[in-house]
Amino acid sequence: MIGRIAGTLIEKNPPHLLVDCHGVGYEIDVPMSTFYNLPATGEKVALLTQQIVREDAHLLYGFGTAAERETFRQLIKISGIGARIALAVLSGMSVAELAQAVTLQEAGRLTRIPGIGKKTAERLLLELKGKLGADLGTVPGGPAVSDDAVDVLNALLALGYSDKEAAQAIKQVPAGTGVSEGIKLALKALSKG
């Protein structure tokens, strides 16, 4: 397995790259989040990679962060989700945004990505639950979600509310609200239905 490639960036044409590593040119596909952070052609580049061996091809996918690569690995484990769709997901949203969408069960955020329909989005939410560090606030480099929001969510779950109900109620709690006040506001939102 090829886990990392470092060399000179020879070509970049979204989402494809050609990286020269000691005279060997590696074709690598990357998500747009990685593509936008690449240096200019002719510069040195280092990418974490995932190699996929198929009957008709050996394919390399490159990532700027370990979190992106791990998320890609989780995505391609899902039945019906291939590397092309996994790259589309990572191109359409950050790892942190995906983790939040999974935690809050927001299929609508996923359906905005080309190639992801309602059924595929629902399958992604189901299969990724608990596999991305998807608890609120646990994805490094993403938008911070306070520990208080996580505590409020956990309290609602402990009270017997479903993940979806709790996630919807959390959206009604303003950022920076303390735990006890957050629970009160979330319960009020749940009682309104």
Swiss-Prot record:
One cellular component (GO) term of this entry: Holliday junction helicase complex
Segment Domain II: which positions? Answer: 65-143
Question: What processes in GO biological process is this protein linked to?
Answer: DNA recombination; DNA repair
| Region ranges (Domain I) | 1-64
Residue span of region Domain III: 151-193
- What are the boundaries of the region Flexible linker? 144-151
Q: Name one GO molecular function term.
A: four-way junction DNA binding
Q: Where in the cell is it found?
A: Cytoplasm
Q: Sorted alphabetically, which keywords does the UniProt record give? A: Cytoplasm, DNA damage, DNA recombination, DNA repair, DNA-binding
Q: Does the keyword Zinc apply?
A: no
InterPro entries the UniProt entry points to:
DNA_helicase_Holl-junc_RuvA_I, Hlx-hairpin-Hlx_DNA-bd_motif, NA-bd_OB-fold, RuvA, RuvA_2-like, RuvA_C, RuvA_C_sf
Q: How does it assemble?
A: Homotetramer. Forms an RuvA(8)-RuvB(12)-Holliday junction (HJ) complex. HJ DNA is sandwiched between 2 RuvA tetramers; dsDNA enters through RuvA and exits via RuvB. An RuvB hexamer assembles on each DNA strand where it exits the tetramer. Each RuvB hexamer is contacted by two RuvA subunits (via domain III) on 2 adjacent RuvB subunits; this complex drives branch migration. In the full resolvosome a probable DNA-RuvA(4)-RuvB(12)-RuvC(2) complex forms which resolves the HJ.
Question: What does the similarity note say?
Answer: Belongs to the RuvA family.
- What does the UniProt entry state concerning the protein's domains? Has three domains with a flexible linker between the domains II and III and assumes an 'L' shape. Domain III is highly mobile and contacts RuvB.
Q: What is this protein called?
A: Holliday junction branch migration complex subunit RuvA
Tell me what organism the protein belongs to: Ralstonia nicotianae (strain ATCC BAA-1114 / GMI1000)
